[in-house]
Design a protein with these regions (language model features):
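Active-site environment of divalent metal-dependent phosphoester hydrolases
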Residues: 28-32, 57-60, 77-80, 94-96, ...
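Pre-active-site segment of Zn-dependent metallo-hydrolases
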Residues: 1-27, 34-43, 95-112, 139-149
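Divalent metal-coordination and catalytic microenvironments
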Residues: 26, 33, 86, 136, ...
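Cap/insert and terminal regions of metallo-dependent hydrolase folds
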Residues: 49-51, 138-197
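Short active-site oxyanion
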Residues: 44-49, 129-131
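Metallo-beta-lactamase
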Residues: 52-128
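Active-site-proximal beta-strand elements of phosphoester/diester hydrolases
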Residues: 1, 85-91, 130-136, 156
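Structural motif
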Residues: 20-21, 84, 129-131, 154, ...
Length: 197
């Protein structure tokens, strides 16, 4: 990736000192990190909320985050953090459906788990504009519902050119279709690749 001019940005969890809330979209550990949770508990003076779907908050509590600081969310929930309004929306991360979660039996071919327990997306309304964070959502025609429901300025979407026989993130074509469906002004690609690459 270096020869493509792509630079990975790594956040030092120990440098986090001032934060209003921690939002996590899903249970995968490239999103949900023990070191980040521990650093926030140790270094941030405020008792900020840890916000995420059920399996995310379950994991935080297993790591020692106090139950009263964990806010379990589902699509349709609206949370106010200071002057910022956060609306929880559906996730379209099919990979989250086949991920084993702590304390749960392995996923079977016959029982489809509840996506909302595993993965969500967020619409964050600020005084500067509205941000949509799709987590690791794959392309879905349902993006158009979210585009109609919210005036989205910036969309954060998971991007990767998938190798043959694997679809883990949105391709460049999917990102374009998602941006059109969300009717957003700017797209910022996240993830930028998949683990097999």
């Amino acid at each position: 990736q270096r020869k493509l001019g792509i630079q990975r940005i790594v956040i030092d969890p120990l440098s986090i000192r001032d934060l209003d809330a921690l939002l996590v979209t899903q249970v995968h550990h490239d999103h949900l990190d023990l070191n980040v949770a521990a650093a926030i508990l140790q270094n941030v003076d405020k008792d900020i909320p840890f916000i995420g779907p059920k399996y995310v908050t379950d994991q935080w509590m297993a790591w020692g985050v106090p139950r009263e600081r964990c806010v379990t969310v589902r699509p349709g929930d609206v949370i106010q953090v200071g002057d910022i309004e956060i609306t929880v929306t559906d996730s379209f991360d099919r990979t989250a459906l086949i991920t084993d979660c702590p304390g749960e039996p392995p996923v079977s071919d016959t029982d489809v788990p509840d996506m909302a327990d595993r993965s969500v997306s967020y619409v964050v309304k600020t005084s500067a504009g509205t941000i949509y964070h799709g987590g690791d959502s794959h392309f879905s025609t349902s993006f158009s519902e979210q585009g109609k429901a919210f005036d989205i300025d910036v969309a954060l979407l998971a991007y990767a050119e998938n190798p043959p026989s694997i679809q883990d993130k949105m391709t460049s074509s999917d990102i374009l279709r998602a941006a059109e469906a969300l009717d957003c002004r700017v797209v910022i690609p996240l993830h930028w690749d998949i683990w097999s690459n």
